[in-house]
């Protein structure tokens, strides 16, 4: 995985466009000829259903399966159960089974690095791995941050998420200090932007004013 870039799409607030950002970025990279793996790290399985697998409960192998295999040291091959989408991206799906991983990870030695250990088995199969994180800062999300080279933060441009952003940046800093010294923030992506409204304009401006000296803001409008 040395030439592969792993990006966590992360924000602990729901409804900010994480899944849409993950899909659009992944498909865009695939259109450029890159080999892309998407990882659904959300118990709701929104990325999985968005890509067409509606009955997530029927999936025999999911991210929970892969993490459990890492914990139990029973890996049967990293590509087993990986799904392929017609847009030429691969997917490690998720369903509600992932919710049990919080307890399982807390009680294992490699609790912060199980996902990193799984990805290390890929042996350079992909150019990019994009992780769609759940809207919380739980152990699965910590695993995503521990496995990532960088973080992209989608931010809904309809309110000022100052407190949530501060908490997220602090969590990323702690992971960088304690577990993943190479982790960095690529930038913020304003989502749901209606540039005709004063609310959107003022929110984007406030984000730029409060965090612009720390975090790059991508222009999406």
How would you name each of these model-derived features?
Residues 1-221:
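P-loop NTP-binding core
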């Amino acid at each position: 995985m040395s030439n592969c870039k792993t990006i966590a799409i992360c924000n602990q607030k729901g409804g900010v466009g994480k899944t849409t950002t993950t899909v659009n970025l992944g498909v865009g990279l695939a259109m450029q000829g890159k080999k892309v793996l998407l990882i659904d790290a959300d118990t709701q399985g929104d990325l999985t259903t968005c890509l067409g697998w509606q009955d997530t409960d029927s999936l025999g192998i999911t991210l929970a399966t892969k993490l459990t295999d890492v914990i139990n040291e029973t890996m049967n091959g990293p590509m087993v159960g990986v799904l392929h989408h017609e847009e030429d991206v691969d997917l490690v799906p998720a369903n509600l089974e992932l919710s049990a991983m919080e307890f399982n990870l807390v009680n294992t030695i490699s609790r912060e690095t199980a996902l990193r250990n799984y990805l290390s088995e890929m042996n350079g199969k992909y150019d990019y791995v994009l992780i769609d994180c759940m809207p919380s800062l739980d152990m699965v999300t910590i695993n995503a941050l521990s496995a990532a080279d960088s973080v992209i933060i989608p931010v809904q441009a309809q309110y000022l998420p100052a407190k949530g952003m501060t908490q997220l940046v602090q969590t990323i800093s702690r992971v960088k200090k304690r577990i993943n010294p190479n982790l960095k923030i690529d930038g913020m992506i304003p989502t749901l932007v209606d540039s005709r409204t004063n609310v959107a304009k003022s929110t984007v401006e406030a984000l730029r004013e409060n965090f612009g000296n720390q975090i790059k803001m991508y222009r999406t409008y």
